[in-house]
């Protein structure tokens, strides 16, 4: 009887319902002067992910990229893209679900966000910008370790008190 109950547990399911651009911004605050200078930029990439439960087994994941290019001490451009997706995810344990929302879904969204950034930079008439792949699995593992360390720190302080 227990075997039948275990077999009736929901098998893991993952479906992409939709991938869409949630927000886009491109600024060239120092144009046209920035185009007159030799192009030797310092490019900085900041990224963030967040997720929200929309319904039972339905989640929105948003990957935010901010790319800032500094050239000759001035901001050449600032590009912000929020690439989002709606995913149906069922039959996973809490740790598996957290990994899916924090690493697997952002891995799916990143190529779309990278293309949007590249397109916006090109439309700004700047040289082509190819963002390197991001290891979201490693970033998520680092995030989990930081959370565990933060949770352990207060417990250690209480034990010493």
Swiss-Prot record:
Q: Name one GO molecular function term.
A: unfolded protein binding
Q: Give the disulfide map.
A: none
The Gene Ontology biological process terms listed for this entry are: protein folding; protein tetramerization; protein transport
Q: Where would one find coiled-coil regions in this protein?
A: none
Main localization is cytoplasm
Question: Could you tell me the keywords of this UniProt record?
Answer: Chaperone, Cytoplasm, Protein transport, Translocation, Transport
Q: Where in the cell is it found?
A: Cytoplasm
Q: Read off the InterPro entries from this record.
A: SecB, SecB-like_sf
GO CC terms, sorted = cytoplasm
Please give the subunit comment from the record: Homotetramer, a dimer of dimers. One homotetramer interacts with 1 SecA dimer.
PANTHER family noted in UniProt = PROTEIN-EXPORT PROTEIN SECB, PTHR36918
Give the family this protein belongs to, as stated in its UniProt record.
Answer: Belongs to the SecB family.
Briefly state the protein's biological role: One of the proteins required for the normal export of preproteins out of the cell cytoplasm. It is a molecular chaperone that binds to a subset of precursor proteins, maintaining them in a translocation-competent state. It also specifically binds to its receptor SecA.
Protein's name in the database: Protein-export protein SecB
Provenance organism: Shewanella sp. (strain ANA-3)
Gene this protein is translated from: secB
């Amino acid at each position: 009887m227990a075997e039948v109950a275990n077999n009736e547990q929901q098998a893991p399911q993952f479906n992409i319902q939709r991938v869409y651009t949630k927000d886009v911004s491109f600024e060239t605050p120092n144009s046209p002067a920035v185009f007159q200078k030799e192009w030797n930029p310092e490019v900085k990439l900041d990224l963030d992910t967040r997720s929200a439960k929309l319904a039972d087994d339905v989640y929105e994941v948003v990957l935010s990229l901010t790319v800032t290019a500094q050239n000759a001490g001035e901001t050449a451009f600032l590009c912000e893209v929020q690439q989002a997706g709606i995913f149906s995810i069922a039959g996973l344990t809490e740790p598996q679900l957290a990994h899916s929302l924090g690493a697997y879904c952002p891995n799916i969204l990143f190529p779309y966000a990278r293309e949007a950034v590249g397109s916006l930079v090109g439309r700004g008439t700047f040289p082509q910008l190819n963002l390197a792949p991001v290891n979201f699995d490693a970033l998520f593992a680092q995030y989990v370790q930081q959370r565990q360390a933060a949770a352990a720190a207060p417990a250690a302080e209480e034990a010493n008190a």
